[in-house]
Amino acid sequence: MIQQETRLKVADNTGAKELLCIRVLGGSKRRYAYLGDTIVCTVKDAIPGGNVKKGEVVKAVVVRTVKSHRRPDGSYIKFDENAAVLLKGDGEPRGTRIFGPIARELREKKFMRIVSLAPEVI
């Protein structure tokens, strides 16, 4: 469950290390983002020489949340951290590698490129 001012780790190799959510996309009254939702973030921490700089405003998709997510079969999935992957304007990932596991819900939300780059889909 991601809302405004939530800090997230970055799960790709774009050079950003930490993000701050500044808007949840999907309507003016939308308060929370869950697995597979798109958010607007600002980069709070980045490595030198990376593709993104500190203070840059970027779009990202949520790939891991601490809040448990109920699946249609009745099982629950949750992770140890909140993490996101940075997106280009066309919805493709900006990085070329994804770190850590991602949720199966991204396949249903049509983020196939992220699913194919991920080392593990849970």
From Swiss-Prot:
GO annotation (BP), single: translation
Alphabetized UniProt keyword annotations: Ribonucleoprotein, Ribosomal protein, RNA-binding, rRNA-binding
GO molecular function: large ribosomal subunit rRNA binding; structural constituent of ribosome
Pfam families: Ribosomal_L14 (PF00238)
Coiled coil: none
Stored InterPro entries: Ribosomal_uL14, Ribosomal_uL14_bac-type, Ribosomal_uL14_CS, Ribosomal_uL14_sf
PROSITE patterns found in the cross-reference section: RIBOSOMAL_L14
GO cellular component, one term: cytosolic large ribosomal subunit
Record's keyword annotation contains Ribonucleoprotein: yes
Disulfide bond in keyword set: no
Entry-linked SMART domains: Ribosomal_L14
Xref: Gene3D superfamilies: Ribosomal protein L14
NCBIfam families: rplN_bact (TIGR01067)
Subunit structure: Part of the 50S ribosomal subunit. Forms a cluster with proteins L3 and L19. In the 70S ribosome, L14 and L19 interact and together make contacts with the 16S rRNA in bridges B5 and B8.
Family of the protein in this entry: Belongs to the universal ribosomal protein uL14 family.
PANTHER family referenced in this protein's UniProt entry, alphabetically: 50S/60S RIBOSOMAL PROTEIN L14/L23, LARGE RIBOSOMAL SUBUNIT PROTEIN UL14M
Function per UniProt: Binds to 23S rRNA. Forms part of two intersubunit bridges in the 70S ribosome.
Protein name (database record): Large ribosomal subunit protein uL14
Taxonomic lineage: Bacteria, Bacillati, Actinomycetota, Actinomycetes, Propionibacteriales
